[in-house]
Amino acid sequence: SLLNDTIRPSPSGELDGGTVSFSPEDFPMIERISCMDIRREQLEAFRSFSLEKDLWIADHRPFKFVKHPLVSAAMVLETFMEAARILYPHLQVRGVRQVRLMDMIQCPPGVPRPSRISCRRVGTGLREVWCEVSLATQEISPAGRLTDRFTPHCKGQVILDGKDGAGGYLGKGLPDFPVRLDELRTRPMDHKKVLKWYKDRSGLEGRYRVMEFLDGAGPGVVRGRTTYRETSDFANLRNARYQYSPYLFEALLQLVGFYIVAMDPSERRSMIPMEIGELRFLRKCRVGEQITLEARMRAQDDKGLAWDARGIDDQGRTIMQVYGLRMHWV
């Protein structure tokens, strides 16, 4: 049964996807479903990114040399997860795998960035359901106008399963963790020093200044801390709920960036995430929760570095782990 229903407000203010209705607060990154085929287990959805509506975008300008703020990798993953969840509302999102981030999505003021999201099931017979998701964005001409061309920006797979309430499954965990304090060689960076780095070396503001302090770094290791915060991220939604904790993933991304800051302060280049082998999470973070961040480098070449990283709660439990996070120099 092909549901060619756009998501539209029903009298109760919910979104209508044909036979299932969704609350916009539960899917803040999906604006409309252009087409959904339950039998083939696939859907096409639409999302326009804009500074006016997406309050979080203005805070995300990781590089001073890029003119406009960017759609963050953390929110791209959230978009992927929401698309998969609409296809399988009875399942829980557990993570993503084989993610490739091919290009940045810049958001100039007054220019919305319309994007197409495609999601389909891949592989069957697993304990988990895997959905392949891709996001393509309408190109902007050199004059700053939208063209007819859509360019693929990122793709990956979302991991879901049906063990409701049981929490996520992290597998056998990451080898050689935890990162021990005696492995660290650099001095700690307190909150004041971290804020100074944000101000001097990046265009990150507010929500995206997620690092609280850095315990330090050593050969191939780094450790720090974040306090989890979520504020009102959307102009049109009061109580948006996410599928995972985007600002914890953001903190793990920034942690490996701070490795370079600590180990080689004279390095002027920046790093950008290109690939994520696999990300899994046990649960979502609570606002105000303090989380220890740690990462180990697994590979290094001329193009960049590959890492495994995790976030740990105050009980010592891993709540998010990332395997094969590949960062490239820019």
Spans of model-derived segments:
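Acyl-thioester-processing domains in fatty-acid/polyketide/NRPS systems
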Residues: 3-330
